[in-house]
Amino acid sequence: MVVCGGPTVLRDLLGADTEPTWKDEEVCVVGLFGKTALAQGSWHKCSLINSLCDRHIFPLFHRAPERPSERSLFQTYYEQESRVLYVLLAGLSDTGSLLKACEELSRGVSHAEAHEWWKDEEKLYCMHLLYLFSVCHILVLVHPTCCFDITYEKLFRALDSLRQKMLPSLKPSLKDCAVGLDWKLNARPCPPRLLFIFQLNGALKVEPKSQGPQTNEKPKKHSPKRRLQHALEDQIYRIFRKSRVLTNQSINCLFTVPANQAFVYIVADEDEDPVNMLLEGLRHNCTLKDTESLVPISGPRRYQMMRHTRQLSFTVENNTSLSGQLVDCTLREFLFQHVELVLTKKGFDDSVGRNPQPSHFELPTYQKWVSVALKLYEIIIENKDDDPPAFPGGFPPKLLANMKVLEGYLDADTKFSENRCQKALPMAHSAYQSNLPHNYTTTVHKNQLAQALRVYSQHARGPAFHKYAMVLNEDCYKFWSSGHQLCEERSLTDQHCVHKFHLLPKSGEKIEPERNPPILFHNSRARSTGSCNCGKKQAPREDPFDIKSANYDFYQILEEKCCGKLDHITFPIFQPSTPDPAPAKNEASPAAHDGEVEGEKMKDKEPQTQGESTSLSLALSLGQSTDSLGTFPEGPKAGGDNTEASGHGTDEKVEKRPSLVDRQASTVEYLPGMVHLNSPKGLLPKFSSWALVKLGPAKSYNFHTGLDHLGFIPGTSYLMPWDIVIRTKPEDESDLDTNSWPAPNKSIPGKRNSVVMGRGRRRDDIARAFVGFEYEDSRGRRFMCSGPDKIMKAIGNGPKESAIKALNTDMPLYMLSPSQGRGLKPHYAQLMRLFVVVPDAPVQIILAPQVQPGPPPCPVFVPEKQEITLPSDGLWVLRFPFSYASERGPCYSPKENQQLPSYKVMKGILRTVTQ
């Protein structure tokens, strides 16, 4: 038997530069595909070719050549004597490829991703099968069991649909090939004939003929194996006819099966003892060795000895027959009865019915077949005429479209999962939309989406779970964003805008509620009552959404009606030098917060008395409010050399330090928020959030009647007295000499002191000032506090408490209002004004407010001018900001579970310096 080399990869065969000597021989192409058993070294498709060619072509433990770009691989072998070209397809159904795929999928891949990857590989395997069905005359399906795998029915229907879709693109590629017109029109030499080879795997015992008791039963005409073959043929034919894979006209079918020839063959292994098999092989080897010169051996000696040793049923079957029983044919005889029809150019006449149509058939030469096979390989397998993929590692567009055809046939799991998930989507949508307001926020959307996903996960199953979970997410977001999205802006009192998603009107633009999206101002529908800068007039106010409307615009409107004619001390603001000034970027160093907290701890450790100087805080603010290139001192040392002035009448002066406003302010960039101790140097806001107004002279305040302002709770509108000691020199101290006699009508000081107690000591004058911390709630209720969390209750002639305690402690910025509402939510009042009556006396009262509206690292806010000397003989009122905000955002009022002491006005807000 003349053979051609060993197995070759099909792509190498088609692209070979040298032409073989048999290029003009007419060849029959036989394709083999199918599944193999999982056991290593078990029955394999390669062993069939070894048996058919009677030659050891493929090794026992054959491994296909590894090509990273190809999971499925074609291998070929040409038997020149019989003029048969075998094309073997190895894919994921083989043990080696399956093991490698499982190793790749075990590297942390999710179930859905693994399923998708596996189905993509199955579709690519179908493309290789389509190629095999397009270039072969005969196809052999190999299966490791004796039961027909029903999944092949879906596979063949998918291949048929895929072939019909790709046929228009295959025809043009063959127009230049030297083959017949029918081949060019149908893109195949003939409708291939499909044969089936099964393995028993112990399902049917094949007893040796010498064994078994002798019986008088009449032997059956067919052996059990042949009867099983006939049963499988009937079953396969019925299945394919019912599913219309096979029809009357073979020219329209993907493949054909013969009507009057066997197309199923069963390979049966004898049940052998391994020890007996080895002993029998040894005997045969010895016998062959003794008679080596007498018996001619064709082919490799080793393979011939293996064949004689094992006597596999698909190699050489015993031709002896029982009486009356037909002899089973060998595997080669089974296959070559169909090959002979090809080589003799008779073709396959497998059409049935009343009017059968003849099918085309062509037997090409080896060279013509290679030219056609190369063209089809480039189109079907390599996709050379396709566009590049949309992304690296993806599939080309045409290949994706072809693979889409296969989804409905092959991916039953995904189809079931998609149907199941699609049924779960309406239930999830209902769960999302249940109990929803017309407009709602992101938080409500996320909560409802989580509830919808819980309902969805109870009903959805399979690999499409994540896909439709994303669809549910998109549907819910689309429902929310199409007219149900509430404006996400929160007011400075931490309340959401009630409008649906809208745009803010630009400068000079009108409000358009009917526009989509509408153009509206923010509105939370919350209203409160506030007082003007001086506190005399009250008016309702809208819930503010920005600092300017909260701390400036509202008071400017009331300023025109009430406080406009009063004296003011204005705070410095940003003065632009360009038409389009820009807000300054946040350049505050994170370390500034640490320095601020450390400085506050230093302040708390040092006891402060009445009127103690706040120069230490000022020094800290100067040292810590630096730009991004600045450095921070290790400790607060700026106030060490400063001589503090006592509130009891010391003559010492306070050394002035330059404040932020004394430096050159920027005229290009403005501060977007409010001034605090960590603000960059030289930056000022465009407006001031503070106000300092003079209500009148000091005598305009009546200690017995208090303030005559609206909204005060009875008995709480009084200011606390603050006695300031002014130290003076004794009378005639310069003229008095203790060593001389006293002047006429004068007594000796020492004796006078000993005689009249207190009449000869230094005379101390006391100036009386008045201080009041006013709190105001959202309903306009106002009251004074005489200390932390202590509401003033004055009866009769005014309060008896002194202001010294309140000035030397941190006053709360928020406290519970004495008039609580009916709800369970606590109602807070906020420190809004500081009233100071400055007497007409030789004393200076310096105002230095510092407010920390939250726990650290909340900044400490100060006015644009940190220290203000209040002129004498006046009733002054400092209006605090309604809301506080830095360049990082607003500082909201405390919640129910937050500690109120963290929101405070620092002690040392007032101090005195005698003149």
Swiss-Prot record:
Chain spans, region Disordered: 207-228, 520-541, 574-661, 733-755
GO biological process: nuclear-transcribed mRNA catabolic process, nonsense-mediated decay; regulation of protein kinase activity
Basic residues composition bias: residue spans: 219-228
Record field: compositional bias (Polar residues): 608-629
UniProtKB keywords: Nonsense-mediated mRNA decay
Biased composition regions of type Basic and acidic residues, renumbered to the chain: 593-607, 649-660
Keyword Transmembrane attached: no
InterPro entries: SMG8-like
Subunit text: Component of the SMG1C complex composed of smg1, smg8 and smg9.
PANTHER family, per the entry: AMPLIFIED IN BREAST CANCER 2-RELATED, NONSENSE-MEDIATED MRNA DECAY FACTOR SMG8
Role noted for this protein: Involved in nonsense-mediated decay (NMD) of mRNAs containing premature stop codons. Is recruited by release factors to stalled ribosomes together with smg1 and smg9 (forming the SMG1C protein kinase complex) and, in the SMG1C complex, is required to mediate the recruitment of smg1 to the ribosome:SURF complex and to suppress smg1 kinase activity until the ribosome:SURF complex locates the exon junction complex (EJC). Acts as a regulator of kinase activity.
Family recorded in the similarity comment: Belongs to the SMG8 family.
Name of the featured protein: Nonsense-mediated mRNA decay factor SMG8
Organism lineage string: Eukaryota, Metazoa, Chordata, Craniata, Vertebrata
Name of the gene encoding the protein in the UniProt record: smg8
